Amino acid sequence: MDIHAIVKQLPHRYPFLLVDKVIELERNTRIKAIKNVTCNEPYFMGHFPGRPVMPGVLILEALAQAAGLLAFDAMGKVPDENNLYYLVGIDGARFKRPVEPGDQLILAITIDRVRGGIWKFKGLASVGDEVACEAELMCTMRSVGEPDRS
């Protein structure tokens, strides 16, 4: 899936679109995507001057965006202005290596389970053979204007 297909599936845009390409997609099971991290990322200006590091929350967001692509594919749906896919929880997030300009972040997501409209994913972000981040992510789809039931 190239960037043109990705922007049809995700509502995010620059500077918050954090998936550049999908390289593997196995329906109802897993996805592998890429985020090319460049020195032009706006967050590097302040995180950190002289030693730029991708913020961990943005690595988690990149994983969540890849999870959204997998979920929409599994449901056979194309998102529209009436439905949004929300990140609703993160468990066990661990950061094991910094992600720096020039790195290619590989985002690997597998579906763990779907129950009561909540999707649970296992996510792994890596650079080469090194794990940068791992986490369990929970997401759900809501219609715009639908009340929060939490």
Swiss-Prot record:
User: Where does this one sit in the cell?
Assistant: Cytoplasm
Q: Where is the active site?
A: H47
The family line of this record is:
Belongs to the thioester dehydratase family. FabZ subfamily.
What CDD domains is this protein classified in? Answer: FabZ (cd01288)
Cytoplasm recorded as keyword: yes
Please name the taxonomic classification of the source. Answer: Bacteria, Pseudomonadati, Pseudomonadota, Betaproteobacteria, Burkholderiales
Pfam families given in the database record:
FabA
User: Does the keyword field hold Lipid biosynthesis?
Assistant: yes
Catalytic activity as recorded in UniProt: a (3R)-hydroxyacyl-[ACP] = a (2E)-enoyl-[ACP] + H2O
One GO term in the molecular function aspect is: (3R)-hydroxyacyl-[acyl-carrier-protein] dehydratase activity
Q: Which InterPro entries match?
A: FabA_FabZ, FabZ, HotDog_dom_sf
Keyword annotations for this protein?
A: Cytoplasm, Lipid A biosynthesis, Lipid biosynthesis, Lipid metabolism, Lyase
GO CC terms on record?
cytoplasm; membrane
Per the UniProt entry, the Enzyme Commission number(s) are 4.2.1.59
**GO biological process: any one?**
fatty acid biosynthetic process
Q: Which SUPFAM superfamilies match?
A: Thioesterase/thiol ester dehydrase-isomerase (SSF54637)
Q: Which NCBIfam families match?
A: fabZ (TIGR01750), PRK00006.1 (NF000582)
Q: What is this protein called?
A: 3-hydroxyacyl-[acyl-carrier-protein] dehydratase FabZ
Which Gene3D superfamilies does this one have?
Answer: Hotdog Thioesterase
Main location per the UniProt record:
cytoplasm
